[in-house]
Amino acid sequence: MAGSSPRQVAVFGATGSIGTSALDVIARHPERLRASVLSAGSKVDELLALCATHRPAHALIADATLYPALRDGLRARGLATQAHAGAEALDALASSDACDTVVAAIVGAAGLPSTLAAARAGKRLLLANKESLVLAGELLTRTAAAAGAEIIPIDSEHSAIFQCLRSCDASRGVRRVILTASGGPFRGRDRAALAAVTPAQAVAHPKWSMGPKISVDSATLMNKGLEVIEAHHLFGLPGEQIDVLVHPQSLVHSLVEFVDGSTLAQLGLPDMRTTLAVGLAWPERVESGVGGLDLLSQGRLDFEAPDTAAFPCLRLAWDALRAGGTAPAILNAANEVAVSAFLQGQVGFLAIPALVEHTLTTLQRHNADSLDTLLFADAQARQITERALAHHALHA
């Protein structure tokens, strides 16, 4: 990348925690990187502020009713940035010459169409939208391979595995990969204690600065379950070769064990700017704004098995991976509805796995042979979960 024109980066989900971290890294390297496209869901004022700072060629607001506010706000600031709105325009930008790299950081299944559009267009895809892989992993990886798109994961765990696997020809030599989990803010609590957890407590992650949905997923261990499914698709590994360990310090991000007995691990401070810098500059390394890891000051590294009795979402994700087909899409959709209800105070913390399990067992799985099939399963799962929300027995 050195000596060439700057990489043109589209940041989808620019106002979220991952989007702002990506823009922080991009701004540190104006000779190498340029934020050429920025998108947001409905936070038009925040998007306008980012446009004033980064001056992209294009800005998009997903909520089309806010298009006039975006257009007029850009004009009022004297910016030449072109305004866009809606899902179709987002997909068009993802596949256009406006970018060669896409940071896919839109939360939830809403991020899937633009992620697929970027893959079809052969872009470098920095994948922070884990739902795209969980919902349509086979389709996404197949599409990327056919178009020559490069998928670089941004999750710290998958970035760690990516970096370890790129250290050698690992096509046949991997015995297993080990994803680490912080354990979330409620590690060590039993189900009785978890019943009283509030949304404010659940979004206060002990190590990472994240958005509310992914913070709750971390607290339930669903985040780790989704990452198991992601790892299966990203690295072509069967579920039997993917393990999980709880590591409360969040310094060892993942490990790869090889058949010769060697184990490689990637360590670093818990800051998403590190993995974003890896994805933006790979195979080069650039400064990310994150300091080095001082193991002496950290003192110790602890590991323990996950408690799937207290946190059954991890078990449910394993079940969905084993079932295959549309089961992961059903899992993901049910979880999105359940987490949203919890964050709105409609249900308790323990209702999240109860709702997900109810939907997984109620809805029959099918072969995931097309995007339409997957989206239909997603819609059905949401309907079943929303109906179950009215059932008091699930409101744990």
Curated annotation (Swiss-Prot):
Ligand binding (1-deoxy-D-xylulose 5-phosphate): K130, S156, E157, S182, H205, S218, N223, K224, E227
Metabolic or biological pathway, per its Swiss-Prot or TrEMBL entry: Isoprenoid biosynthesis; isopentenyl diphosphate biosynthesis via DXP pathway; isopentenyl diphosphate from 1-deoxy-D-xylulose 5-phosphate: step 1/6
Binding site for Mn(2+): D155, E157, E227
Family: Belongs to the DXR family.
Function summary: Catalyzes the NADPH-dependent rearrangement and reduction of 1-deoxy-D-xylulose-5-phosphate (DXP) to 2-C-methyl-D-erythritol 4-phosphate (MEP).
Keyword Metal-binding listed: yes
Catalytic activity: 2-C-methyl-D-erythritol 4-phosphate + NADP(+) = 1-deoxy-D-xylulose 5-phosphate + NADPH + H(+)
Pfam families found in the cross-reference section: DXP_redisom_C (PF08436), DXP_reductoisom (PF02670), DXPR_C (PF13288)
Name this polypeptide is given: 1-deoxy-D-xylulose 5-phosphate reductoisomerase
UniProt-listed GO biological process terms: isopentenyl diphosphate biosynthetic process, methylerythritol 4-phosphate pathway involved in terpenoid biosynthetic process
Keyword NADP set for record: yes
Domain of life from the UniProt record: Bacteria
Database matches in InterPro entries: DXP_reductoisomerase, DXP_reductoisomerase_C, DXP_reductoisomerase_N, DXPR_C, DXPR_C_sf, NAD(P)-bd_dom_sf
Enzyme category, top tier: oxidoreductase
Protein residues bound to NADPH: T15, G16, S17, I18, G41, N129, E131, G211
Cofactors required: Mg(2+); Mn(2+)
Native species: Xanthomonas axonopodis pv. citri (strain 306)
UniProt-listed Enzyme Commission number(s): 1.1.1.267
NCBIfam families reported in the protein's UniProt record: Dxr, PRK12464.1
Record keywords, A-Z: Isoprene biosynthesis, Manganese, Metal-binding, NADP, Oxidoreductase
Disulfide bonds: none
Molecular-function annotations in GO: 1-deoxy-D-xylulose-5-phosphate reductoisomerase activity; manganese ion binding; NADPH binding
